[in-house]
Design a protein with these regions (language model features):
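Carbohydrate-binding surface patches
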Residues: 412-465
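Beta-strand-rich modules
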Residues: 576-596
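Pro/Thr/Ser/Gly-rich low-complexity, intrinsically disordered linker/stalk tracts
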Residues: 512-542, 581, 596-608
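Substrate-binding cleft and catalytic face of glycoside hydrolase catalytic domains
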Residues: 80-283
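Aromatic-lined carbohydrate-recognition surfaces of secreted/lumenal glycan-active proteins
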Residues: 199-201, 223-252, 304-322, 349-361, ...
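Glycoside hydrolase catalytic-domain groove-lining segments
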Residues: 273-326, 350-359, 379-383
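Aromatic/acidic polysaccharide-binding cleft in carbohydrate-active enzymes
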Residues: 323-418
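C-terminal beta-strand-rich structural cap/linker in extracellular carbohydrate-active enzymes
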Residues: 483-515
Length: 608
């Protein structure tokens, strides 16, 4: 992430005075009252396995001792309905998928068995993976006059800017260095063929992750070699123009001019942290946060660049606005994240939020994690409020498409509210089944302490097809029934207006089954006559627990998984006495209920 975001109905509004909130309730017609008992009271979660095309998250891979796989954080990816993940950085350092880990001796490439398990856990549980291929390797890219023949990766506490002699932020620049890097790229793409399909070149190459500082011509020359290295190794693989830190059009244009490979780029990625270090609302990404630059203008120059694919995708693959920044807190973050995600979604941009869980041995403490990291405190590995905002956004808006035919005219409002002049944003989307959902909010600067003066407005929603409207608070997940104004099918007399996303949809929108949360914290120990397994059970009313075992041959962890036990849903341990001797055995568990199965737990292994 950097040391420093979408197009819809944006109109200036004038707001009726008042202090009513969603929690204070709303007038309900008779039909709304009779429907209330049929509605869920909160947004039912949707798991990753239930989503085809949704939002993404960045995550460090598990790493002891600060991000142990045996704690309850990793499986929350699947429980929260995350559809995509971006891996390749441990905080602001390198990861076991990085060049300096994969090639530690010249010409010798390897991935640890643990990383294989992490990647398989993601893909087996329905998450699509993009991996960043980065950074330099001191055996090739160090400016030293004498280069080592072997290296040991540095601990995860290092970070940019780092111009020390053997820093990994010295990039490949010479033909020999570029050839060495593309050898690593080809090996990675071939190794993960069939499991990983998206490969990004570098991370924030326009700032201090590229020594001595971002250089578009140098990046363009590396990109020119990267594109064929990926596509020729795996014709099904996709190339990502690695996430640019700032929406600077000149950097992108110069890189593409040098590369002359525009037709080979499948995804263009950039990052947004409007007002980095201070509270600045996400919509300013296109209206002042970056001066004359903006993500919208950046996408336009890419779209018009000669040779660019007409179907190129745009990803904002790092976005956050954290509570630790000046003038902010966790309540502000919980509002801003859905606002940014939906603002992007309406523009056809997929958002990957930064970051799942903080590795606190990095250089940014616990600041960015949607789940707290290890600080030896009671709330270690517990979610911040923003995690539930993310989960609700995933459940409601994943797999939807922006529908410009759904119109939400600007409400006719008075001039007495403190936020007068603030843009009102409203977007209509449709699910794969054609069901409409509308998101609306006031694009205001949110204050710490959830102090926004809430109001009520009349709202007209044209061409939605919604018959029995309900109101959803994205931050809290609360659902309440509404009723159309008598004699109309598109006018709501009085709905809340907030600085957080509210959604209106039909009462039958929530048509997905609620699967159990995944068991977590699986451990295995050798016991008399076998293996002793223990795990933690979570929500979703599990009625059963399935235990699966993998017996690996010849040291490989690619053998099929087989179910060895079906247990009652409250069971949290199991003793396996049937594992074959002299074998390496893996275990995983999942929960089930009448609706289906959860994601799998973490994987544990034991050698008999």
């Amino acid at each position: 992430m950097p040391d420093k975001v979408a197009k819809g109905h944006s109109r200036t509004i004038l707001i009726v005075a008042g202090m009513l909130t969603l929690a204070a309730g709303m007038p309900l017609g008779i039909s709304a009252q009779t429907r209330k008992s049929r509605l869920p009271d909160h947004v039912p979660p949707k798991r990753s396995s239930q989503i085809k095309n949704g939002f993404g998250i960045n995550s460090d891979l598990p790493r002891d001792p600060y991000l142990p796989w045996s704690r309850w954080w990793w499986t929350r990816i699947f429980d929260a309905g995350v559809s995509w993940i971006r891996i390749g950085q441990y905080e602001n350092s390198s990861e076991p998928t990085s060049w300096d880990w994969v090639e530690q001796k010249r010409g010798v490439y390897s991935i640890s068995p643990e990383v294989e398990d992490y990647v398989n856990s993601l893909t087996d549980n329905g998450v699509k993976v993009q991996v960043q291929l980065l950074y330099g390797n001191p055996m090739y890219t160090s400016p030293a006059g004498r280069l080592p023949d072997a290296i040991t990766p540095e601990p995860g506490s290092f970070h940019n800017d780092d111009r020390s002699l053997y820093s990994v932020f010295w990039p490949p620049k010479t033909p020999e260095q570029i050839e060495a890097f593309t050898n690593y790229v080809k090996w990675m793409v071939n190794h993960f063929r069939g499991r990983i399909h998206y490969y990004a070149l570098w991370n924030e190459q326009d700032i201090g992750y590229w020594n001595p500082w971002g250089n578009p011509e140098e990046y363009g020359r590396l990109l020119k070699a990267f594109v064929p290295a990926v596509h020729e190794t795996d014709p099904e693989a996709k190339v990502i123009y690695g996430g640019q830190a700032d929406p600077t059009r000149d950097f992108t244009k110069r890189a593409l001019d040098t590369c002359q490979c525009a037709a080979g780029i499948d995804v263009y990625a950039y990052h947004t942290y409007p007002g980095y270090g201070r509270n600045l609302n996400p919509e300013t990404m296109d209206s002042g946060a970056y001066g004359k630059e903006s993500p919208r203008a950046l996408r336009e120059i890419v779209r018009r660049y000669p040779g660019i694919r007409p179907d190129i995708e745009y990803w904002d693959d790092e976005f956050n606005s954290i509570g630790a920044w000046k003038g902010s807190d966790d309540s502000v973050q919980a509002k801003y994240i859905p606002r940014g995600m939906i603002y992007n979604w309406a523009a056809g941009v997929r958002t990957f939020v930064w970051l799942l869980t903080a590795g606190t041995d990095g250089n940014e403490f616990d600041d960015f994690g949607f789940i707290h990291g290890l600080r030896y405190r009671p709330d270690d590995f517990t979610p911040r409020a923003v995690f539930y905002s993310l989960q609700n956004t995933n459940a409601l808006f994943s797999d939807t498409k922006f529908d410009p035919s759904i119109q939400i005219p600007t409400p006719d409002l008075a001039e007495t509210h403190p936020a007068k002049g603030t843009p009102f944003l409203a977007y209509g989307f449709r699910s794969p089944k054609g069901k409409a959902i509308v998101a609306y909010w006031l694009a205001a600067h949110s204050e710490p302490g959830n102090k926004f003066p809430a109001d009520r407005i009349g709202l007209k929603i044209v061409n939605s097809g919604i018959k029995h409207p309900v109101l959803i608070d994205i931050v809290s997940g609360e659902i309440k029934p509404l009723a159309w104004k008598e004699g109309t099918t598109d006018v709501l007399d009085s709905v809340p207006l907030l600085d957080s996303v509210l959604a209106i949809t039909d009462e039958d929108y929530f048509d997905w089954p609620v699967l159990p949360e995944s068991p977590s914290s699986l451990t295995v120990t050798a016991a008399s006559g076998g293996a002793q397994l223990k795990w933690e059970i979570h929500g979703g009313n599990p009625s059963g627990i399935e235990v699966e075992r993998q017996v690996a041959g010849d040291g490989a962890d690619s053998a099929p998984w087989k179910k060895i036990a079906q247990l009652p849903g409250s069971t949290a341990e199991y003793s396996d006495t049937t594992a074959p001797p002299s074998s390496r055995v893996g275990y995983r568990v999942r929960a089930s209920n009448d609706a289906g199965e959860s994601a799998y737990s973490n994987i544990v292994r034991l050698t008999f």
